[in-house]
Amino acid sequence: MSTTASTSSNNLTFTSIVKSFFESYSKTPQKLKIIDLFLIYTFITGVIVFTYCCLVGTYPFNSFLAAFISTVGCFVLTVCLRIQINPINNFGKTISIERAFTDYLLCNLILHLVVFNFLG
């Protein structure tokens, strides 16, 4: 009987954690929520590319690597943008949103030039 009580206690703890997460996430600015949606999209694209590689094969291996590097690189750069824009993550350095977004665009341009060059 004690395992049932501890299991229900764990469920209450899990539900309280999930509820707390959604309550705190509802206070997140709209800009960060849009970035989060793009991160989810990029992650799903990377999973699709990797699944395609596993199921179908990697005949044009450079194309697979270019697509996968593009999704991973774009994901990492977007996470960096989210960290820079988030007002909670102010570590004493004040970077304007415009500067962070410009850095993001330039890094994405360099990333995709490298990916395009890698296609051959």
Swiss-Prot record:
Stretches of the chain found on the membrane's Lumenal side: 58-60
Keywords: Endoplasmic reticulum, Membrane, Transmembrane, Transmembrane helix
InterPro entries noted in UniProt: DAD/Ost2
Highest rank taxon of the organism: Eukaryota
Pfam annotation, one family: DAD
Pathway: Protein modification; protein glycosylation
UniProt GO cellular component terms: oligosaccharyltransferase complex
Homology family: Belongs to the DAD/OST2 family.
PANTHER family per the UniProt record, alphabetical: DOLICHYL-DIPHOSPHOOLIGOSACCHARIDE--PROTEIN GLYCOSYLTRANSFERASE SUBUNIT DAD1
Protein name: Dolichyl-diphosphooligosaccharide--protein glycosyltransferase subunit 2
Organism: Dictyostelium discoideum (Social amoeba)
Native organism taxonomy: Eukaryota, Amoebozoa, Evosea, Eumycetozoa, Dictyostelia
Designated gene of the protein: ost2
